Amino acid sequence: MAVQQNRKSPSKRDMRRSHDALGFSTLSTDSKSGERHRRHHVTKDGFYRGKQVIVHPVESVEVDDEV
């Protein structure tokens, strides 16, 4: 098991943790739909880099003719 040789000061601990903060994700605008999305991710409409890569199925409406 690893055991530290000397105790680290709070300053050294905080300097090590200085890079742990979460940053904001970079957003891009789709050229086709104009929708904002995370970079390198598909938009909610299914577009990626101006091309439709996912086609959402159309919900069919059932009609009852038994009236």
UniProtKB/Swiss-Prot annotation:
**The keyword Ion transport is assigned to this record:** no
What GO molecular function annotation could you give as one example from this UniProt entry? structural constituent of ribosome
- The lineage's top-level taxon is Bacteria
One cellular component term from this protein's GO annotations in UniProt: large ribosomal subunit
Against InterPro entries, the record matches this protein to:
Ribosomal_bL32, Ribosomal_bL32_bact, Ribosomal_zn-bd
| Residue spans of biased composition, Basic and acidic residues class | 11-20
Q: Which GO terms describe its biological process?
A: translation
Keyword presence, Ribosomal protein:
yes
**Record key words, sorted:** Ribonucleoprotein, Ribosomal protein
As for family, the record states: Belongs to the bacterial ribosomal protein bL32 family.
Name used for this protein in its record: Large ribosomal subunit protein bL32
Source organism per UniProt: Dichelobacter nodosus (strain VCS1703A)
